[in-house]
Amino acid sequence: DLFVPPSAALAGKIYKTLMSQVTAGKKFGGINEVEGVRFDLKKSEIANLESLGLIPMVNEYGKVMAFSGKTLFNGDNLGLQTYSVVRVFDYVTKVLMDFLNRRAFENFTATTRKDIMNQIVQFLDSITGPKNLIENFEIRRFEQDPKQKDRIYLDIHMKPYFPAKNFLIKMDGHKGTDANEWDTEYEQK
C-alpha cells in the first residue's frame, strides 16, 4: 500500500472552491480518487486534532474528506480562526489597496471622492450576496483628515459568511393525553 499525504489534494480543492466557502465536510471537503485514510477517527479525536490546529482527514459517507476550517490563530476572534473569512478579508484588502494606490496623488475633490466611492461600492456590490464572498457591507467613513490633508480615511464594515459547524437539536413532547412531558437536548461537537 502507498500512503500519500493529502495536503496537495486539499490545496487543489481549496484553490478551486469559492473563497468564502470552507473546504471541509461532505459536500465541499471530499477528496476525489482517494480510497481511505491511514486510521479511522472518532468524533472526539477529530475535535482534539482540530483544536491542535490540524486538519483531520475522515473516511465517512463513503468518501475521504477534510474536517476542519480553522486557521492557526488561537485568540478570541472567530473570524481570524476561520480560514475562509481570512481569505476573503485578505482578498478585499489587496484589491482595495491596489485600486487606491492607482488613485494616489489625485486632488481629493468632491468629484474625485464621489468617483472613488462609486467604484468601491460597485466592487463590493459585485462580491455581495449568496454564492459570493460577503453577506453585506457598509461604508461607514470616507473622508479627508481635517488636519493632515494627504490622509484619507476609509472605514468599511463587511459581514462575511461563516460555515455551520455545530448543530444543536432540542426536542420535547408528551405521551398520549397524559401530562407526562419529556425534554431532551443533543449537542454535537
Predicted ranges, named:
Residues 1-189:
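Structured, hydrophobic secondary-structure cores that serve as assembly/anchoring elements
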